[in-house]
């Protein structure tokens, strides 16, 4: 899946005296199968940019093309559910994404939320936990009992399980 960002601008509180430009005419291409990191100073717009990649935020101006899908300011949130299945995000502190009582439940949450059966979600969770190096001894463990690195792997597995 390739991502093309064209002239993307985002203005918080647009049309008010509190308007603040977070992104101003950004152009960016992310090629298919390319892992990309967004880095920069505090307040530089990293989080705002990343939230546009799966339409958590919509552009004030410009557009984002993900494969054949073009996202503009006038999108309806219900039309974006399929897109959110395809674009997964892992934030700087992915362990903050963890919330279920066991690792297996946490990694299964995404697939279930997007319509997979309990069995399908659990099978997918087990597959991706293996990929990130967490064997069955982790399934019933609380994510909060894990080391920082293990928490990150659980969070990454949760994103991968949605594929």
Q: Where are the language model's segments positioned?
A:
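A short, flexible loop at the N-terminus of ABC-type nucleotide-binding domains that lies
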Residues: 2, 11-25, 75-79
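Conserved ABC ATPase signature
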Residues: 142-146, 150
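Conserved ABC ATPase "signature" region
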Residues: 119-137
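The feature captures the beta-strand-to-loop junction immediately N-terminal to the Walker
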Residues: 39-41
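Hydrophobic anchor residue at the start of the ABC signature
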Residues: 156
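Conserved ABC transporter NBD signature motif
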Residues: 62-73, 83
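Helix-to-loop junction immediately C-terminal to a conserved catalytic motif
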Residues: 54
């Amino acid at each position: 899946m390739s991502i093309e960002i064209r002239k993307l601008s985002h203005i918080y509180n647009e049309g008010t005296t509190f308007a603040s430009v977070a992104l101003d005419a950004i152009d960016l291409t992310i090629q298919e199968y390319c892992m990309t990191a967004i880095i920069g100073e505090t307040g530089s717009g990293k989080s705002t940019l990343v939230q546009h990649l799966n339409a958590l935020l919509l552009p004030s101006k410009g557009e984002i093309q993900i494969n054949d899908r073009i996202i503009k300011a006038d999108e309806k949130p219900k039309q974006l559910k399929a897109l959110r299945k395809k674009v997964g995000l892992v934030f700087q502190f992915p362990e903050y994404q963890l919330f279920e009582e066991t690792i297996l439940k946490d990694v299964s949450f995404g697939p279930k939320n997007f319509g997979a059966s309990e069995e399908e979600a659990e099978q997918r969770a087990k597959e991706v936990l293996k990929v990130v190096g967490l064997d069955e001894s982790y399934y019933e463990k609380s994510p909060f009992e894990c080391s920082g690195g293990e928490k990150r792997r659980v969070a990454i597995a949760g994103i991968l399980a949605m594929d």
